[in-house]
């Protein structure tokens, strides 16, 4: 069983260097090709493409200028990302055996890196998958990545007893997984809040819950998708009446 999560816009590189392994991102050729494009972008280009402030545009231009796909340095991706999903995952509190297990079962989808493993060396960047960045391969990053991400996930799941891909990513990022090229059955987890008799998806809670599900899988070394139905962290419960074979709904009373 393999799970995928989205990256985060915010990063935290203040974490002390650890004794954890640092692995090389798998899609080096594509990363190098894409970094040649991003290096040419001006701050004005980035502001327009990503709808960000002048300050963030300047910061990210500096990041792209400094980015070197040949340098095998950085911080482990699962440690460096710092958003709601990663607050739920709380990887900095996982011990080494748990993180080593996650290295084989967790993948992070990325606009710049394509697919990251937890220990992969991450350099500071920001490039959302939905960015309409033109390359030789097309008008946006979905065109650029094509079938590459799906093929990489297929390879990652080889040898797993249960080949199911557990989708804990956002629609923006999972949209980069080419359905025709993917050879794995997919289960997408949805997290909803109940209030006044109605169920709603609330962004902050849903993002954190995706991270909590990833943590639940890692803590319990779950390698069969059916066992996810036992997820009960933070008050969530599986809702069989609202679920299908491909879309599993978990709900709780809204805090």
Swiss-Prot record:
Q: Name one GO cellular component term.
A: cytosol
Instruction: Give the domain of life.
Output: Bacteria
| Biological processes annotated in GO | response to hydroperoxide
Q: Which Pfam families match?
A: H2O2_YaaD (PF03883)
Q: Which HAMAP family match?
A: UPF0246
In the record, the note on similarity to other proteins reads: Belongs to the UPF0246 family.
Q: What is this protein called?
A: UPF0246 protein CCNA_03496
Which species is the source of this protein? Caulobacter vibrioides (strain NA1000 / CB15N) (Caulobacter crescentus)
């Amino acid at each position: 069983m393999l799970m995928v999560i989205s990256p985060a816009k915010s990063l935290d590189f203040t974490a002390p260097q650890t004794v954890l392994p640092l692995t090389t991102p798998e899609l080096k050729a594509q990363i190098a090709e894409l970094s040649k494009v991003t290096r040419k972008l001006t701050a004005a280009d980035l502001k327009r493409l990503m709808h960000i402030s002048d300050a963030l545009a300047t910061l990210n231009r500096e990041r792209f200028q400094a980015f070197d796909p040949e340098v095998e340095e950085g911080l482990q991706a699962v440690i460096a990302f710092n958003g709601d999903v990663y607050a739920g995952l709380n990887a900095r509190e996982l011990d080494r055996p748990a993180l080593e297990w996650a290295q084989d079962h967790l993948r992070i989808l990325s606009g710049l890196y394509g697919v990251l493993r937890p220990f992969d060396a991450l350099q500071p960047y920001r490039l959302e998958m939905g960015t309409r960045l033109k390359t030789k391969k097309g008008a946006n990053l979905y065109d650029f990545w094509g079938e590459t991400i799906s093929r990489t996930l297929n390879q990652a799941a080889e040898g797993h007893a249960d080949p199911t891909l557990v989708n804990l990513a956002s629609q923006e990022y999972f949209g980069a997984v080419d359905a025709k090229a993917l050879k794995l059955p997919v289960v997408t987890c949805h997290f909803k809040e109940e209030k006044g008799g109605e169920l709603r998806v609330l962004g902050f809670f849903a993002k954190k819950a995706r991270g909590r599900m990833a943590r639940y899988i890692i803590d319990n070394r779950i390698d069969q998708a059916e066992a996810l139905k036992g997820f009960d962290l933070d008050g969530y419960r599986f809702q069989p009446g609202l679920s299908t074979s491909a879309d599993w709904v978990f709900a709780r009373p809204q805090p």
